[in-house]
From Swiss-Prot:
Enzyme class: hydrolase
EC number: 3.1.-.-
Stated family: Belongs to the helicase family. AddB/RexB type 1 subfamily.
Protein name as catalogued: ATP-dependent helicase/deoxyribonuclease subunit B
Annotated positions binding ATP: G8, R9, A10, G11, S12, G13, K14, S15
Subunit note: Heterodimer of AddA and AddB.
Highest taxon of source: Bacteria
Keyword DNA damage (UniProt): yes
Cystine residue pairs: none
Length: 1171
């Protein structure tokens, strides 16, 4: 029994020496004693290749490469102890979830924390750490007793409570495992116990290579190996000079020095012979003087400079994507020009979550075979999502999001249907569920679902159309596709008495859905498209899910569990599933994490993402215990993993390892922005490298090749897939700025695409975008007639929409596009309710021959409650009755109607105008409808403007009859003559024109009436600020002022007094007008003469004719208006359709100038020739 150290700096040949010794021994004695070669898990594959890479050694039974966990399997198979069931990470998380749920009420700190994302991952890591550091539950309990007895501060009490929770959960976990199961950490403890019984290890020659430190658990394994083996050889990256000096935590080799001393101490304790250490002083790895210099002087202070050309390259990239593309181009160059193989190249990085997706995409585009040494989670695979969402459907009462997450996995689809057809139908089905607010019991009820197109609150026709019946049948068919398998599983889960039966219910759910066949179809499709990675995913996921169910049954099969706990535990297990890495092929670029990689002897290394806070890593407190808490436990004798401070001290060694992997070339790069455009800073590590290599230039990598020289641009020509975007970029430059010197070269590349049989069609679609202009072409007369017909019948709102944006009008009224209907109460629904409620109250008053003035406040309250109760079942598929929240909202809406009724009562008492008609239709046909506003357009098309007028008021005096329009609005609004001029506010003046043109309708003896004005009535329940001692009357007066109607009224003092008979001088509390003492109007009055009203009405006719002409002539310009801070695009539903983009030459707003009312009126006169 002896111990031998082989030490040396990086690249000194430690592994090579050991491998050569083994190979020589195998050549001399192929059947001698066992030779064990122990390496970290990540090194096993490459070490096996290296071991049998010699021409004289093509294979061996005597020598085997192991990691500690693989050695545990080997020994336990030999001597026994492997009969207990292995539980993987997913199983551990599931068991911990169950333990936490059952212990929840007794936990002090983790009761709420258990609901946070990642909690069980951290808890599992903490328990694994306890085991690796030989800390038992009883040790943790003793620590809690010690802490609890001496806790005085809040921080100490928190730590004591945290340790108490950990002790409870750790103890329960160990009790659940004992005698039945083994987790990955238990294998190492068993290995310690079983190694003395192993004949396989006894007398073996043992090499331990590639480690820098050992956990206490691993150190115990090393102890047993030294006792059982003939000789143990351990390699450590360590400078011999360091051993001659006192240990300093700032030393580069501090960690490996401690490891060296710990192992020697173990050897002394076991009286193991310690052979003379073999120090290796040469640098055989490095074929480059620059890399040899970097390794030899890495830790020197001040930095030792290397002058002259170096094989170290530094790149700064515009962004992360440009950085990865730069790496891809250089890899292709090395392979093409310098005879590198892909396996000679490695890419090292730390923040893989930012890079992996981009690297997969770009390396595939650049045709670079690659292997990412990182396990991917299965959480996004359709099968995992299907199980998780189906369980959430059942435990969460059939919520919309869970149902359609399950639907979108496409595993609920019948096996024999076309997926494309089913997707379209399910999209329609989802729209129905959103519109009708389908969830909860409606899914499980046997009552068929109904489909009716919503028309209006006044539509009481119960007849169903053929198209509605057809849609209803489809909806119920699709409902059964979705709910039938889930309801079957739901019934089985509710009947289940044990976890085993619940797992069986999940399995039967998958089997009845033909999931294995569907996954096989997905695998075949992936293989046919050349995506072999995803093809294997579909195989792995089924096996892992079945293994998870087996583990669940093995651990907890006979236990009873609530459905919610079963769902939580299953979800926790599913989240922990990972795809196994496919072993790399013989010729791939290796992409690996800096902290976990153990690669060696690659020719070129690319270290990417070298940004501040990443390399070196910024300090982060992660996991269950903070650094301060770890220090407290360490002081009390419990050794755990290194603190953040210790980890930061080890960063220099990690970076040293990182830059000493390559034999010939080292590339270091960092992006200046991430994928979202956020600024990133270069790491101080790059500055260190620049100081060591002052002649090395920092090259900037960009995706914009315009500023590069011709020779630099040539490097951007890679694969056809990648190069096409750069061709586009250059041709865009030519299009905008004309000929450039380098463009002739890019014309040659362009000619390749247009002449290549393979690429001609593919590239034409992309290149056609060069001449793309986001401009809508005018419709032909024939198309316009097909869309709009020979007779246009439209509302005033439609005409205003055209003037806001012609393309929005085309999308809504030409193409009939609309957003999908969602079961929610929007502003239009509330507006419709307000209109209907006030109309019902007014109709009741008319039937009773009463007016608003006749109502008492109590009657206002009663009537508002009655009409809201009548309307609620009719509005938006009974939305106001659908939940407690909406019931509360119904009460708030009733209060608004009540308040509005009171104000209308006050207005009626103060006004000579009385309502003579409500919700007056014009151009609608039928009894009571006024005629439309009709136009004969120059191209022969007839146009009718139709609509519905909220309220018509009439007043009479000795000067004649006056009519005014009242429009109810759920938001504050005034009449802006500038918007009238631009055709954006035509509604009120149109209504006034219609009623004055048909004045005889409301006059007993016929005749004409004069326009009295147009006013907006704001329906709301305002809050007013008053002094503390204000009386109720004063408060009511302030509220009344909040309801002052804005608009435009006739500039006649008598008419204004008819509107507010309390007005003598000053401002009216009812309308936006006021009188001075001399009888003239105040400056703030919104008034117009009768002649001006006539001009305005004439202008409205003129505007409608122009709009009708443009519509019928096919004008669909993408030209939204912008006026001050208002723009047509702000609330437009069609932005994703028109793709309006101000950065494009053809896309600019129509900027409308704001004007005073007098200026707008003058322009209106000019347009119509008015006086």
């Amino acid at each position: 029994m002896s111990l031998r150290f082989v030490i040396g700096r990086a690249g000194s040949g430690k592994s090579t020496l050991c491998l050569h010794e083994v190979q020589e021994e195998l050549k001399q004695r192929p059947r001698g004693e066992t030779i064990l070669y122990l390496v970290p898990e990540q090194m096993t594959f490459q070490t096996q290749q290296a071991l049998i890479g010699s021409e004289d050694v093509r294979g061996s039974i005597r020598a085997q490469v192991f990691s500690f966990s693989r050695l545990a399997w080997k020994v336990l198979q030999e001597v026994g102890g492997a009969s207990r069931l292995h539980i993987d990470e997913a199983g551990v998380h599931m068991l911990l979830r169950k333990i936490v749920e059952s212990r929840k009420d007794g936990l002090s700190v983790f009761q709420k924390a258990a609901e946070q994302n990642g909690f069980f991952e951290h808890l599992g890591s903490m328990i694994a750490e306890f085991k690796r550091y030989n800390v038992t539950p009883s040790n943790v309990y003793e620590m809690w007793q010690q802490l609890d007895a001496h806790s005085s501060s809040a921080e100490q009490k928190l730590l004591a409570n945290k340790v108490y929770d950990l002790q409870l959960l750790y103890d329960d976990f160990e009790r659940a495992l004992i005698g039945k199961y083994l987790d990955s950490e238990d294998y190492l403890q068993l290995l310690v116990e079983k190694l003395p019984q192993s004949e396989y290890v006894k007398g073996a020659e043992i090499y331990i290579d590639g480690f820098h430190s050992f956990s206490p658990q691993e150190l115990e394994i090393v102890r047993q190996l030294m006792i059982c083996g003939a000789r143990v050889t351990i390699t450590l990256t360590l400078d011999e000079k360091t051993l001659a000096q006192p240990v300093n935590e700032l030393d580069l080799f501090y960690e490996t020095t401690l490891t060296y001393e710990k192992i020697k101490q173990v050897a002394r304790e076991e009286k193991i012979e310690i052979e003379k250490t073999i120090p290796l002083m040469e640098q055989p790895r490095f074929h480059s003087p620059a890399l040899a210099h970097l390794e030899a002087h890495y830790e020197a202070r001040p930095n030792e400079k290397f002058n002259g050309e170096a094989s170290v390259t530094i790149h700064t990239a515009a962004n992360l994507r440009a950085e990865v593309e730069g790496v891809a181009r250089e890899i292709r160059r090395l392979v093409a020009d310098e005879d590198y193989r892909y396996r000679d190249i490695a890419v090292l990085l730390r923040n893989g979550e930012s890079y992996y997706d981009v690297m997969r995409t770009l390396f595939t585009d650049y045709n670079i075979p690659h292997f990412i040494d990182e396990k991917r989670p299965m959480s996004h695979h359709p099968l995992v999502e299907c199980i998780r969402s189906a369980l959430e459907i059942i435990s969460g009462n059939w919520r919309y999001d869970a149902v359609f997450r399950c639907v979108k996995t496409e595993l609920l689809y019948p096996l024999d249907v076309r997926k494309e057809t089913m997707r379209e139908e399910m999209d329609e089905f989802e729209n129905y569920c959103l519109a009708y607010g389908v969830q909860g019991k409606r899914w499980t009820s046997e009552d068929p679902w109904m489909y009716r197109r919503y028309r209006s609150l006044d539509d009481t026709n119960g007849m169903i159309t053929d198209s509605e019946r057809e849609m209803e049948e489809k909806i119920n068919r699709l409902r059964d596709v979705v709910r039938t398998p889930v309801i079957r599983m739901q019934k089985r889960l509710k009947r289940a008495g044990t976890v085993m039966q619940m797992c069986e219910a999940v399995y039967l759910f998958l089997e009845e859905l033909d999931v294995p066949k569907k996954l096989e179809a997905l695998r075949i499709r992936a293989e046919e498209s050349g995506d072999f990675l995803f093809a294997t995913d579909h195989e792995q996921v089924w096996e892992e899910v079945m293994s998870l169910l087996d583990t669940f049954v093995e651990m907890l099969g006979e236990e009873k569990m609530s459905l919610s706990m079963f769902t939580d535990v299953m979800s926790t297990g599913l989240e922990a599933l990972q795809f196994a890495n496919i072993p790399p092929s013989l010729d791939q670029v290796l992409i690996a994490n800096i902290d976990r990689s153990r690669l060696s002897n690659v020719k070129a290394t690319f270290v990417i993402g070298v940004n501040e806070g990443v390399i070196p890593a910024a300090p982060m407190d992660e996991g269950m215990l903070s650094d301060e808490e770890r220090d407290v436990l360490s002081a009390a004798g419990i050794e755990l993993a290194p603190t953040t401070r210790q980890t930061l001290l080890e960063e220099q060694f990690v970076m040293y390892q990182m830059v000493t992997r390559a034999t010939e070339k080292l590339y270091i790069s960092c992006p200046l922005a991430d994928e979202e455009g956020k600024t990133l800073l270069a790491s101080s590590f790059i500055k260190k490298i620049k100081r060591m290599f002052p002649d090395v230039k920092d090259t900037f990598i960009t995706n914009d090749v315009n500023d590069l020289s011709r020779s630099e641009q040539i490097s951007y020509v890679a694969t056809p897939e990648v190069t096409l975007s750069y061709v586009m970029q250059q041709l865009q430059t030519w299009k905008r700025y004309g000929f450039e010197g380098n463009l002739d070269f890019w014309w040659d590349v362009y000619n390749f695409y247009v002449t290549s049989d393979e690429w001609k069609q593919k590239s034409s679609r992309v290149l056609s975008s060069l001449f793309y202009r986001n401009r809508a072409q005018k419709l032909s007369t024939a198309v316009s007639r097909d869309l709009y017909g020979d007779k246009i019948k439209g509302s005033v709102s439609r005409m205003e929409l055209f003037n806001r944006c012609a393309y929005a009008h085309f999308a809504q009224h030409g193409l009939s596009l609309r957003e999908r209907d969602i079961f929610k109460l929007d502003a239009p629904d509330i507006g419709e309710l307000f209109h209907a409620a006030l109309k019902r109250i007014a109709d009741r008053l008319l039937r009773e021959n009463r007016t608003w003035a006749d109502l008492s406040i109590k009657e206002c309250e009663h009537l508002s409650a009655v009409v809201i109760e009548e309307i609620a079942p009719l509005l938006q598929r009974q939305i106001l009755l659908s939940s407690n929240r909406h019931f509360y909202l119904k009460q708030k809406l009733q209060q608004i109607i009540f308040r509005t009724s009171i104000i209308l009562r006050e207005h009626a008492k103060s006004s000579g105008f009385v309502p003579v008609d409500l919700e007056v239709p014009f151009g609608m046909g039928g009894t009571g409808s006024l005629p439309p506003m009709e136009f004969s357009l120059p191209n022969g098309v007839k146009m009718e403007v139709v609509g519905r007028i909220d309220r018509v008021d009439k007043a009479e005096d000795e000067n004649g009859t006056f009519l005014r329009i009242i429009d109810y609005k759920s938001s504050s609004k005034a009449l802006d003559l500038t918007e009238v001029y631009y055709g954006l506010a035509l509604q009120m003046l149109t209504y006034l024109d219609v009623v004055t043109s048909n004045a005889h309708t409301w006059m007993k003896k016929g005749g004409t009436a004069s326009p009295a004005g147009v006013l907006y009535f704001h329906i709301h329940n305002p809050i007013v600020e008053v002094k503390g001692d204000a009386s109720e009357a004063e408060i009511e007066k302030e509220i009344l002022k909040k309801f002052k109607m804005k608009g435009l009224v006739l500039g006649d003092a008598d008419v204004v007094r008819l509107m507010d008979n309390k007005l003598s001088t000053g401002s009216s509390d009812i309308i936006s007008a006021g009188l001075k003492k001399d009888g003239s109007f105040s400056a703030r009055s919104s008034i117009a003469s009768e002649q001006e009203f006539n001009v305005l009405q004439k202008y409205v006719h003129h505007t409608f004719e122009n709009i009708g002409k443009d519509i019928t002539e096919g004008v669909i310009d993408i030209a939204p208006y912008k006026k001050g801070n208002k723009a047509a695009c702000t609330f437009c539903n069609f932005k994703s359709v028109c793709q309006f983009d101000e950065s494009l030459e053809d896309n600019q707003f129509r900027t409308l100038k704001d004007m005073k009312d007098s200026e707008a009126m003058e322009k209106i006169r000019e347009e119509v020739g008015g006086e």
